[in-house]
Swiss-Prot record:
Part of the ribosomal stalk of the 50S ribosomal subunit. The N-terminus interacts with L11 and the large rRNA to form the base of the stalk. The C-terminus forms an elongated spine to which L12 dimers bind in a sequential fashion forming a multimeric L10(L12)X complex. One of its GO terms (cellular component) is large ribosomal subunit. Keywords: Ribonucleoprotein, Ribosomal protein, RNA-binding, rRNA-binding. The keyword Glycoprotein does not apply. PANTHER family: 39S RIBOSOMAL PROTEIN L10, MITOCHONDRIAL. The keyword rRNA-binding applies. It comes from the Bacteria. One of its GO terms (biological process) is translation. CDD domains: Ribosomal_L10. GO terms for molecular function: large ribosomal subunit rRNA binding; structural constituent of ribosome. Pfam families: Ribosomal_L10. This is Large ribosomal subunit protein uL10. Belongs to the universal ribosomal protein uL10 family.
Length: 172
């Protein structure tokens, strides 16, 4: 990479750090290309992304962002996972690390909050925004559905009684 490419990469990574809801930093020593591709595809499916960056460039890109507190995590072979949904990147990274012990989560950040490895794991155990929205909609819809069932039940019962009475008269 020449200087111009490095500057462009640093500015791009800086924008990614500023826009993301959460960032996860992990060591990936020993992961095969297939495993790394699998991690990238799972993260992409969750709406996030995975990047391998030189530690020095990542530290420069962190300057001026809320996530600046995680710059000390960039030692060794590090990979950065990030997503707009604050739960998506930690959830995918933790699930992948459970199945593959070569991905070691070092920590991360959510906004200005710096997280250690346990913080990332506890963040991953929370439901995602979509799951929370689905639960909220379900809670709102349940009373309306019950009300609809209760109001339609008497009409249905009357229709069944009239139908039974009509069948009884036809049989007689």
């Amino acid at each position: 990479m020449d200087r111009a490419e490095k500057r462009e990469f640093v500015s791009w990574l800086n924008g990614a750090f500023k826009e993301s809801g959460s960032v996860v930093v992990a060591h990936y020593t020993g992961l095969t290309v297939a495993q790394m591709s699998d991690l990238r595809s799972k993260m992409r499916d969750a709406g996030g992304s995975v990047k391998v960056a030189k530690n020095r460039l990542a530290k420069i890109a962190l300057q001026g962002t809320e996530s600046e507190g995680i710059s000390d995590l960039f030692t060794g072979q590090t990979v950065v996972a990030y997503a707009n949904d604050p739960i998506a990147a930690p959830k995918v990274a933790v699930e992948f690390a459970k199945a593959n012990d070569k991905l070691v989560i070092l920590g991360g950040a959510m906004g200005a909050t710096t997280l250690n490895a346990d913080g990332v794991k506890s963040l991953a155990s929370l439901p995602s925004l979509d799951e929370l929205r689905a639960k909220l909609v379900g809670m709102i819809q349940t009373p309306a559905q019950r009300l609809a069932v209760l109001t339609s039940a008497p009409a249905g019962q009357i229709a069944r009684v009239i139908g039974a009475h009509a069948r009884k008269n036809e049989a007689a």
